Swiss-Prot record:
Keywords: Nucleus, Ribosome biogenesis, RNA-binding. The lineage of its organism: Eukaryota, Metazoa, Chordata, Craniata, Vertebrata. Residues 1-92 are annotated as: N-terminal domain. It comes from Rattus norvegicus (Rat). The gene is Nip7. One of its GO terms (cellular component) is preribosome, large subunit precursor. This is 60S ribosome subunit biogenesis protein NIP7 homolog. It comes from the Eukaryota. Required for proper 34S pre-rRNA processing and 60S ribosome subunit assembly.
Protein backbone atom coordinates (compact mmCIF):
# COMPACT_ATOMS: atom_id res chain seq x y z
CA UNK A 1 0.00 0.00 0.00
CA UNK A 2 1.63 3.20 -1.16
CA UNK A 3 0.66 6.71 -2.25
CA UNK A 4 0.25 7.29 -5.97
CA UNK A 5 3.11 8.82 -7.95
CA UNK A 6 2.64 12.14 -9.77
CA UNK A 7 2.09 10.35 -13.09
CA UNK A 8 -0.39 7.85 -11.62
CA UNK A 9 -2.30 10.65 -9.90
CA UNK A 10 -2.47 12.66 -13.13
CA UNK A 11 -3.74 9.70 -15.18
CA UNK A 12 -6.34 8.76 -12.56
CA UNK A 13 -7.60 12.33 -12.05
CA UNK A 14 -7.91 12.85 -15.83
CA UNK A 15 -10.11 9.76 -16.06
CA UNK A 16 -12.28 10.74 -13.08
CA UNK A 17 -12.55 14.33 -14.38
CA UNK A 18 -14.17 12.97 -17.58
CA UNK A 19 -17.15 12.01 -15.42
CA UNK A 20 -17.33 14.66 -12.68
CA UNK A 21 -15.30 17.58 -14.08
CA UNK A 22 -14.19 20.20 -11.58
CA UNK A 23 -16.30 18.46 -8.92
CA UNK A 24 -13.19 16.34 -8.42
CA UNK A 25 -12.21 18.85 -5.75
CA UNK A 26 -15.34 17.90 -3.75
CA UNK A 27 -14.24 14.28 -3.81
CA UNK A 28 -10.81 15.07 -2.39
CA UNK A 29 -11.77 17.80 0.14
CA UNK A 30 -14.69 16.29 2.03
CA UNK A 31 -16.26 17.88 5.12
CA UNK A 32 -16.60 14.53 6.92
CA UNK A 33 -12.87 13.81 7.05
CA UNK A 34 -9.69 13.54 5.06
CA UNK A 35 -9.71 10.96 2.29
CA UNK A 36 -6.85 9.86 0.06
CA UNK A 37 -6.04 7.48 -2.77
CA UNK A 38 -3.67 4.56 -2.22
CA UNK A 39 -2.27 1.98 -4.65
CA UNK A 40 -2.20 -1.71 -3.77
CA UNK A 41 -1.66 -4.51 -6.34
CA UNK A 42 -2.28 -2.09 -9.27
CA UNK A 43 -5.66 -1.14 -7.79
CA UNK A 44 -6.45 2.35 -6.51
CA UNK A 45 -8.38 2.57 -3.24
CA UNK A 46 -10.23 5.59 -1.85
CA UNK A 47 -9.85 5.44 1.91
CA UNK A 48 -10.21 7.73 4.92
CA UNK A 49 -6.98 8.58 6.69
CA UNK A 50 -8.42 7.26 9.96
CA UNK A 51 -8.84 3.77 8.48
CA UNK A 52 -5.47 4.09 6.75
CA UNK A 53 -3.77 4.65 10.11
CA UNK A 54 -5.53 1.61 11.59
CA UNK A 55 -4.39 -0.57 8.68
CA UNK A 56 -0.77 0.60 8.87
CA UNK A 57 0.23 -2.35 11.04
CA UNK A 58 -1.06 -4.96 8.54
CA UNK A 59 1.57 -6.28 6.14
CA UNK A 60 1.01 -5.64 2.43
CA UNK A 61 0.93 -9.30 1.42
CA UNK A 62 -1.85 -10.03 3.95
CA UNK A 63 -3.94 -6.98 2.99
CA UNK A 64 -6.67 -7.83 0.47
CA UNK A 65 -8.63 -4.57 0.23
CA UNK A 66 -8.89 -1.25 2.01
CA UNK A 67 -11.57 1.38 1.50
CA UNK A 68 -13.37 1.55 -1.84
CA UNK A 69 -11.71 0.33 -5.02
CA UNK A 70 -11.91 3.13 -7.59
CA UNK A 71 -10.23 1.28 -10.40
CA UNK A 72 -7.02 -0.28 -11.54
CA UNK A 73 -4.01 0.47 -13.67
CA UNK A 74 -3.59 -1.77 -16.70
CA UNK A 75 -0.25 -3.16 -17.84
CA UNK A 76 0.03 -0.26 -20.28
CA UNK A 77 -0.41 2.21 -17.36
CA UNK A 78 -3.91 3.29 -18.35
CA UNK A 79 -6.51 3.71 -15.61
CA UNK A 80 -9.78 1.77 -15.76
CA UNK A 81 -12.62 2.75 -13.43
CA UNK A 82 -14.47 0.00 -11.55
CA UNK A 83 -18.19 -0.05 -10.86
CA UNK A 84 -17.38 0.22 -7.14
CA UNK A 85 -16.58 3.91 -7.77
CA UNK A 86 -20.15 4.58 -8.94
CA UNK A 87 -21.41 5.60 -5.49
CA UNK A 88 -18.81 8.37 -5.38
CA UNK A 89 -19.11 9.49 -9.03
CA UNK A 90 -22.92 9.62 -9.28
CA UNK A 91 -23.58 12.53 -6.85
CA UNK A 92 -21.01 14.74 -8.59
CA UNK A 93 -21.69 13.77 -12.22
CA UNK A 94 -21.90 16.68 -14.65
CA UNK A 95 -23.35 14.71 -17.55
CA UNK A 96 -26.12 12.18 -17.01
CA UNK A 97 -28.16 9.82 -19.14
CA UNK A 98 -31.49 8.34 -18.05
CA UNK A 99 -32.61 5.14 -19.73
CA UNK A 100 -36.10 3.72 -20.13
CA UNK A 101 -37.20 0.75 -17.99
CA UNK A 102 -37.14 -1.56 -21.01
CA UNK A 103 -33.47 -0.78 -21.69
CA UNK A 104 -32.30 -1.15 -18.08
CA UNK A 105 -31.91 -4.92 -18.22
CA UNK A 106 -29.95 -4.75 -21.46
CA UNK A 107 -27.57 -2.18 -19.95
CA UNK A 108 -27.18 -4.23 -16.76
CA UNK A 109 -26.16 -7.23 -18.88
CA UNK A 110 -23.26 -5.19 -20.28
CA UNK A 111 -24.72 -3.88 -23.54
CA UNK A 112 -24.50 -0.37 -24.95
CA UNK A 113 -27.45 2.04 -24.71
CA UNK A 114 -29.41 2.45 -27.94
CA UNK A 115 -31.39 5.54 -28.95
CA UNK A 116 -34.62 3.57 -28.49
CA UNK A 117 -33.74 3.05 -24.81
CA UNK A 118 -32.72 6.65 -24.13
CA UNK A 119 -35.08 8.49 -21.78
CA UNK A 120 -33.26 11.81 -21.21
CA UNK A 121 -29.77 13.19 -21.60
CA UNK A 122 -28.12 16.22 -20.03
CA UNK A 123 -27.99 19.25 -22.32
CA UNK A 124 -24.65 20.11 -23.95
CA UNK A 125 -23.20 16.62 -23.58
CA UNK A 126 -20.42 16.34 -26.13
CA UNK A 127 -19.39 13.25 -28.04
CA UNK A 128 -17.05 10.89 -26.10
CA UNK A 129 -17.89 12.63 -22.82
CA UNK A 130 -18.04 10.45 -19.70
CA UNK A 131 -21.63 10.05 -18.48
CA UNK A 132 -23.33 8.40 -15.51
CA UNK A 133 -26.29 6.22 -16.51
CA UNK A 134 -29.44 6.41 -14.37
CA UNK A 135 -32.79 4.65 -14.43
CA UNK A 136 -35.85 6.86 -14.89
CA UNK A 137 -36.30 6.63 -11.09
CA UNK A 138 -32.89 8.35 -10.61
CA UNK A 139 -31.09 5.20 -9.46
CA UNK A 140 -27.46 5.14 -10.71
CA UNK A 141 -26.95 2.03 -12.86
CA UNK A 142 -23.43 2.55 -14.18
CA UNK A 143 -21.33 4.77 -16.35
CA UNK A 144 -20.20 4.98 -19.92
CA UNK A 145 -19.06 7.26 -22.72
CA UNK A 146 -21.46 9.25 -24.90
CA UNK A 147 -21.25 7.94 -28.45
CA UNK A 148 -23.19 10.95 -29.76
CA UNK A 149 -23.61 14.52 -28.60
CA UNK A 150 -26.96 15.73 -27.27
CA UNK A 151 -27.81 17.37 -30.61
CA UNK A 152 -26.86 14.25 -32.59
CA UNK A 153 -29.02 12.04 -30.33
CA UNK A 154 -32.13 13.87 -31.51
CA UNK A 155 -31.46 13.03 -35.17
CA UNK A 156 -30.15 9.44 -35.17
CA UNK A 157 -32.19 6.33 -35.91
CA UNK A 158 -33.61 4.30 -32.98
CA UNK A 159 -31.07 1.45 -33.31
CA UNK A 160 -27.99 3.70 -33.12
CA UNK A 161 -25.72 3.45 -30.08
CA UNK A 162 -25.82 6.63 -27.97
CA UNK A 163 -23.81 5.49 -24.91
CA UNK A 164 -20.90 3.06 -24.91
CA UNK A 165 -21.02 0.77 -21.87
CA UNK A 166 -18.11 1.06 -19.40
CA UNK A 167 -19.40 -0.43 -16.13
CA UNK A 168 -22.74 -1.24 -14.50
CA UNK A 169 -24.08 -2.56 -11.21
CA UNK A 170 -24.73 -5.94 -12.82
CA UNK A 171 -20.97 -6.52 -12.60
CA UNK A 172 -21.39 -7.14 -8.88
CA UNK A 173 -23.01 -10.43 -9.89
CA UNK A 174 -21.19 -11.17 -13.15
CA UNK A 175 -17.68 -10.56 -11.76
CA UNK A 176 -18.14 -11.06 -8.03
CA UNK A 177 -15.01 -13.20 -7.71
CA UNK A 178 -12.69 -10.54 -9.15
CA UNK A 179 -14.13 -7.38 -7.55
CA UNK A 180 -12.22 -6.26 -4.48
Amino acid sequence: MRPLTEEETRVMFEKIAKYIGENLQLLVDRPDGTYCFRLHNDRVYYVSEMILKLAANISGDKLVSLGTCFGKFTKTHKFRLHVTALDFLAPYAKYKVWIKPGAEQSFLYGNHVLKSGLGRITENTSQYQGVVVYSMADVPLGFGVAAKSTQDCRKVDPMAIVVFHQADIGEYIRHEETLT
